[in-house]
């Protein structure tokens, strides 16, 4: 069988995340339905991660096996003609038979966007997290350095994960500002359940002046979820890139 790799952009607002589930609408379900319409085959598409309800993606990676003779690059147009407008295939290609979108990843980059102004957003309400009080961005940037490297991120994991270890390596974490938007980029070899959202919630405690930057090290060393910040909403989170 042939192995087709897809790079997918999607708006997660209307979906219950990536992974197919009986209770509702998911990205995986929609993509599999589109593949069936194109190939007349029942397939199971393998995704690079399980993004939660409301989370978006610029370059999600998935793959599926098929007996179809459609050229790999042509799946992009074929599937886009069958998909809803909030899910778009931005690239399709045939890859080695042993390629696996999830198990072969070496890392991912996420971005979380905060809108830091008094007025709540109207147009971007599904893509940012609104914080009314002015944040101390410089202190947040200073705090980021404590996340870098290999640590046990047990304090940054919500109940519900099934991983064997909570040790992860954050290879890059930095903050960029665009007007009243604060963008927090986090790259790691892997992520725990809600890890990015908890990192952002903890950085907000620093940004609001409730804690000093060194507080981040205390939370990591404690391994105590209760010491970390809130789990911010999914709306501001976007999967930027998957590495292989």
From Swiss-Prot:
Gene3D superfamilies: Pseudouridine synthase I, catalytic domain, C-terminal subdomain (3.30.70.660), Pseudouridine synthase I, catalytic domain, N-terminal subdomain (3.30.70.580)
Gene: truA2
Similarity field: Belongs to the tRNA pseudouridine synthase TruA family.
Keyword terms: Isomerase, tRNA processing
List of catalytic residues: 52
Summary of the function given for this chain in its UniProt record: Formation of pseudouridine at positions 38, 39 and 40 in the anticodon stem and loop of transfer RNAs.
Keyword Isomerase: yes
InterPro entries hit by this protein: PsdUridine_synth_cat_dom_sf, PsdUridine_synth_TruA, PsdUridine_synth_TruA_a/b_dom, PsdUridine_synth_TruA_C, TruA/RsuA/RluB/E/F_N
Enzyme class: isomerase
Subunit structure, interactors included: Homodimer.
Substrates-to-products reaction catalysed: uridine(38/39/40) in tRNA = pseudouridine(38/39/40) in tRNA
Binding residues annotated for substrate, in chain numbering: 110
Species this protein is from: Clostridium perfringens (strain 13 / Type A)
Any one GO biological process: tRNA pseudouridine synthesis
Protein name: tRNA pseudouridine synthase A 2
Lineage: Bacteria, Bacillati, Bacillota, Clostridia, Eubacteriales
HAMAP family (UniProt xref): TruA
Pfam families linked to this entry: PseudoU_synth_1
Presence of keyword tRNA processing: yes
NCBIfam families xrefs: hisT_truA
A single GO molecular function term of this UniProt record: tRNA pseudouridine(38-40) synthase activity
EC number(s) from the headed UniProt entry: 5.4.99.12
